[in-house]
Amino acid sequence: MNRQLKTFAKYILKSSFRRQIEDLLDRCGEHSVNVPAHRERSIELLTRQETDVGVFSDYIAFLPAIECAIRKGHIPVVDRKTIHNTFLSNYADANTWEFYFEQPCSVGLDDLNNDSDEVVRSYSSANVPVSLIDCRDEATVQYWRQFARRYIRFTPELRQQLAETERELFPAGARVLGVSIREGYNKLFQMNSKIAVGHPFQASTEEMLSQAKQRLEEWNCDRLLVTCQTEETVELFRRTFGERCLCVERPRYTYEALPEGERAREAVRKTDQRQHELDYIKEIYLLSRCTSFLCSKNSGSEAAFIMSEGYEHFQCFELGLNR
C-alpha cells in the first residue's frame, strides 16, 4: 500500500513529475553528433531504441523528451529514420514520424547544417512516463495537454482527414461514450509471451461491454464509439447497441487469427503499413473527441487522454503490469 501511495504521490506536483522525467532521460544518455566551429543553433535528435511499438507509444515517449530538449535550449528533431519502428519498416529511407506529425519546431533532419548546427543525439526510453491518466492534479494535466498541442501536431493533411472522419461518423451534437479495447494484449498474456512483460493488463471485452452498458445511460450519452482489433468485438457491440454503436471501418482480424508477438512483425510487413497506422490514429483521435471515456491503460488511451480537452466522465481500469 505504501508503495502505491508513493507511486501516486509523484504525480501531485508538476515539478516532481518533471524531475522524475529528467532523471530517467539522464539515464538514457546523450552524445555529440556534430560540433561546428561557429554554432548558430543547438539541435537535439530524439531517437528511440524500442522498435516494436505503435505510433502512440512514440507519442507518449517523445512528449517528455521534447519538453526536456526545449528547456535545455535545444531545437528538438524527432528521428524515426535512424532506428525504425517495425510497424513502418517498409519505409527505410523515410523519417516515419513525419508521415503523421510535424516536427516540434518545424526543423527536420533534412534541414540540418553541419557548418553551423551543433547536434546532439538523445535516446528516449519506454520507461519515461507521461502518465496523465494517473495524474490527480488538474494544473499538471492541462500543462501537458497544452504542451502536446503546441509541439506534437498532426500534419495539415492528416488534420483535414481527421476532421472529415469526425464529421462523417459523429452525428451533430451527439454525446459519445468512447470505449477503448485492446484484445491483442490479452492474447499476448494468454500466450505467456516475453513481449507481454511490463505491459499493463487489460479489462476483458466482456467486462468493457458490461461497463459500457452501465455508463452509457449513467453518463447520459446517446452514442458509443468502440475502438478494437477484432471482428468479434465489433459484432458484439453492434448487436448490443444497434445504431448507437459507432466504429471506424478498417480491416480487422478474428480473435483466433489476431497476430501477436513475432507473428505480428511478420504480418505487418505484408500490410499497407501507413494505412494501418492511419486507421489507428483515426480511432485514437476520435476517442479524444468523445464526451466521456472508458478504457484500460495503454499508450493509445494515454494519447487520447492527452489530446482531449477533458472528459465529462472518465474511467480507466488499472489492473497492474504483467511481470
Give, region by region, the residue ranges found by the protein language model:
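Boundary detector for helix-to-coil junctions that initiate low-complexity/charged tails
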Residues: 1-14
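Secretory-pathway glycan-assembly enzymes, especially type II membrane glycosyltransferases
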Residues: 17-209, 213, 218-219, 223, ...
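Short, flexible/disordered intra-domain loops and linkers
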Residues: 51-52, 188-203, 255-277
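A donor-sugar binding/catalytic signature common to diverse glycosyltransferases
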Residues: 63, 280-322
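Conserved beta-strand termini and adjacent loop/short-helix elements that scaffold enzyme active sites
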Residues: 79-81, 227, 247-251, 316-319
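Short glycine-/acidic-enriched loop or helix-start segments at secondary-structure transitions
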Residues: 88, 235-237, 304-306
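Catalytic donor nucleotide-activated moiety binding site of glycosyltransferases and closely related
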Residues: 180-187, 216-271
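A short, acidic, amphipathic alpha-helical segment used as a generic capping/interface helix at domain edges
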Residues: 210-212, 276-282
